[in-house]
C-alpha cells in the first residue's frame, strides 16, 4: 500500500511457490527513479516456503542497496498468503501471452476469503497492447481495471488496511468488497510485506 500513499521508494518481498512444478523463489519488487518496477528473483528451496533464511534476507538487502544506495533496515514479517490456479496461454507467433487466474484465496491468520469459482482475472501481454486477446475482450465489453494488485485486493478484502477506495473497482469485480471498517489491530499490518504463492498480475479485466 506504499503506492496508495504516494511513497516513491517502495519495496515488496514475496515468497512464491509453483505447486505443480515444485519450484520456489524469493522475489523483491522495487520502484526505480522513473517509477518503473524492478523485480529480482532468487531460487529458493521449496521446503523453506513461508520463511526467509539468511540467504534470502541478504538477497533483499543486496537488491535494495543496488537500487537505492542504502542498506535495507526494515524488519520483514509475513502479512498475507494468497493461492490461486493459473492457466497460461502463449501465441505460437508474435509473443502474445495471456494468463487466467481463478479460485483466489486470501488468508491472514485465522481469517480467509475466496472468490467465486466463476470469476477470473485475465492478464494480456502483447507488443502494442492490441493483441487478438485484447480485441476479443473489448468485443465482450470486458475492459481493463485501472488499478489492480492481488496483494492490495487481498489486504482490503480481509479488512487489514484503512484505505482501499482506489481498488474498489477491482474489489467489486471480484465481489470481495469489505463489509466493515478495519479495527486498529487489523490496521497494524500496514507497511509490512507480503508472501504469496504466485505472480501478482498488473492488469485486470
Briefly describe each language-model feature range.
Residues 1-205:
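Phosphate-end processing signature that detects enzymes handling 5′-triphosphorylated RNA
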Amino acid at each position: 500500500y506504499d503506492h496508495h500513499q504516494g511513497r516513491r521508494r517502495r519495496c515488496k518481498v514475496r515468497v512464491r511457490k509453483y505447486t505443480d512444478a515444485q519450484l520456489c523463489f524469493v522475489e523483491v519488487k522495487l520502484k526505480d527513479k522513473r517509477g518503473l518496477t524492478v523485480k529480482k528473483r532468487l531460487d529458493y528451496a521449496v521446503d523453506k516456503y513461508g520463511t526467509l533464511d539468511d540467504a534470502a534476507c541478504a538477497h533483499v538487502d543486496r537488491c535494495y542497496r543496488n537500487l537505492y544506495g542504502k542498506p535495507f533496515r526494515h524488519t520483514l514479517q509475513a502479512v498475507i498468503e494468497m493461492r490461486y490456479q493459473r492457466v497460461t496461454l502463449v501465441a505460437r507467433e508474435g509473443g502474445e501471452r495471456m494468463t487466467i487466474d481463478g479460485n483466489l484465496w486470501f488468508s491472514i491468520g485465522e481469517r480467509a476469503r475466496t472468490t467465486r469459482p466463476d470469476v477470473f482475472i485475465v492478464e494480456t501481454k502483447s507488443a502494442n497492447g492490441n493483441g487478438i486477446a485484447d480485441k476479443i475482450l473489448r468485443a465482450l465489453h470486458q475492459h481493463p481495471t485501472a488499478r489492480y494488485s492481488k496483494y492490495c485486493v487481498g489486504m482490503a478484502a480481509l479488512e487489514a488496511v484503512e484505505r482501499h477506495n482506489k481498488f474498489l473497482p477491482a474489489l467489486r469485480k471480484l465481489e470481495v468488497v469489505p463489509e466493515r471498517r478495519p479495527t486498529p489491530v487489523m490496521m497494524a499490518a500496514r507497511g509490512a510485506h507480503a508472501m504469496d504463492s504466485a505472480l501478482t498480475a498488473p492488469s485486470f479485466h
